Amino acid sequence: MRALRDTSDILVIGAGIVGVSTAIWLQRSGVSVTLIDRDEPGSATSYGNAGILASASVIPVPTPGIIKKVPGMLLNPNKALFLKWSQLPRLLPFFYKYLLNSNSDSVFKISNALSYILYDTVEQHLEISKGTNAENYITTNDLIFGYSDKIAFENDSYSWDLKQKHGHKFSSLSRADLAKYDKNLKNKFGFAVKCMNHGTISDPGVYISELFKSFVNKGGKFLKAEVKDILFDNFRNPIYLNTNNGDISCNKIVLTAGVWSAGLAKKLGVKIPLTSERGYHVEYHSPNIEFKAPVVISDSKFIIHSMQGRLRCAGLVEFGGIFQPESSHPFKLIEKKIETLFPQLKYERKTYWMGHRPSTTDSLPVIDISPNYNNVWLGYGHQHIGLSAGPKTGKILSEIILSKNTNRDLSRFSASRDGLIK
């Protein structure tokens, strides 16, 4: 089959928030870019998230003490951690390295790196969306964490102390304070925490679609195709992408395909442990309740967020790979909790979604040039923070590619960093 000629300077594989952001920042620097994805831009993992620009999400899932808690959590259907047991043998090597990073020293280093990429998330989103229709979907807001009582909050003191060390501001709310803040939260939680300086996206899928439209309107191109392989010349430069629509010629490539990056990365000789932390959401359409700010249900680890015309309840963690069907238990947990907390909730219909968060063993993304091939860059592995960190990751990648801001220390996001490859 004859190769299709692409005249763009750079091809970006993956059109979620990271890929679209990378394409936009490259385009704004005068580079011609083609985005490639098997799906429509922003329609996969970037679509179904909770819509939070979470500057304070600097705590990884594995923290001190979790190793003792995991068995009980997995065996309790009312806890927020799930596992497709058939996948356990395949996941054991990942879990071993993943849980090794739950010690306090590792968590502190990881939180430092997460803080760097998240502290200005709202500003980064405002900057990339400025002058586009996407900016209409961004709002600065608080983020509320609801607890059954103050003791439950104090049991989370490790995480809150670490957030405070990174400069994140929050205030406590009593039951009465919470009722004054939002009447819909009256008598729902015995204690709460209000985090300031966060942001929300009222419709993540449409938001990313609008960013993509601005990219296309300024000359960017999009190819709907599934990339199967990358072919190189004798000098380790990419020359073709092998896709289900034929071979596409190329000179420079950026790999930003989320959890689906793993297969192509292996072909590049990049041995980064990567798996899917599957997330779930239930949406209640045309609800009779609208919340002032998103609320984290702390004991169930999901967020309720009033979006445009619907209430999205999103979160949880399931380790189950990318090929297994969705599970019913996560949906049931969300529904049961919502029915218990808000029996007055009325709605027209419910919809269900499951997506794949790409997670590395140290909970940090890879933002780097390929260590083995020229003119190939990597940007994936953002676990729960993909939406929040997408624009900044795209800006960093564009600067690496164009040799700008070379004094930036990106060793913590290296494809060959200590603690990731063993």
Predicted regions, residues:
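Active-site substrate-recognition segment that forms the wall
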Residues: 51-52, 57-101, 229-232, 237-238, ...
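A conserved short coil-to-beta-strand element within the FAD-binding core of flavoproteins
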Residues: 173-181, 223-238
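N-terminal Rossmann-like FAD-binding beta1-loop-alpha1 element of flavoenzymes
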Residues: 8-35
